[in-house]
């Protein structure tokens, strides 16, 4: 029995960011006591079973342990860059070996197991700016106005804190708009 979750909060979602953590808890049973084992976990894409790569190498974590009881659990943490993986489902393959053996004593590679799957968030943001007075897109030149920017979003991770900030941009030039004192309008 295994469970993969966000290592920083326990949800089934991780941010599309650098240095994210997937915590994989592997529960075992019927192991011979006082024997040495090695647990190997590999991150793969659920859609294909192909490994998730970091610097062109599969992301693999190995952990050695001695079974103190026939039943127990082991945690493994995978730290990696998920910034380009928005919307992807990541699965953890596990293999259990007797120490110094090359053939796995137990394998868990069922891509359909939702307990082993973590989804990389795919946040979307949309803004609609309008004249606060009448809701139109028209502003009077040379008059002080307030622009209301309505922000809508989806795909955020529940329980995470996000910050919304904006800068008024000149559509024609692509440059920030500045006020009479030269300050960028935010």
Regions flagged by a language model, labelled:
Residues 1-186:
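Solvent-exposed loop/turn and edge beta-strand elements of beta-rich ligand-binding domains
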């Amino acid at each position: 029995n295994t469970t993969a979750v966000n290592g920083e909060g326990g949800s089934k979602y991780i941010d599309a960011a650098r240095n994210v953590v997937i915590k994989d808890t592997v529960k075992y049973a019927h192991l011979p006591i006082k024997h040495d084992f090695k647990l190997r976990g590999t991150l793969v894409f659920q859609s294909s079973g192909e490994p998730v790569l970091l610097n062109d190498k599969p992301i693999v974590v190995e952990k050695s342990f001695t079974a103190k009881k026939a039943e127990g659990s082991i945690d493994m943490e995978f730290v990696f860059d998920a910034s380009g993986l928005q919307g992807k489902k990541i699965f953890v393959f596990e293999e259990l070996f007797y120490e110094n053996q090359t053939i796995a004593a137990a394998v868990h590679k069922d891509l359909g197991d939702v307990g082993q799957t973590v989804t990389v968030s795919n946040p979307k943001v949309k803004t609609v700016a309008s004249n606060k007075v009448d809701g139109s897109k028209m502003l009077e030149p040379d008059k002080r106005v307030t622009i209301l920017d309505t922000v809508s979003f989806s795909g955020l991770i529940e329980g995470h804190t996000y910050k919304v900030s904006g800068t008024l941009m000149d559509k024609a030039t692509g440059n920030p708009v500045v006020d009479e004192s030269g300050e960028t309008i935010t």
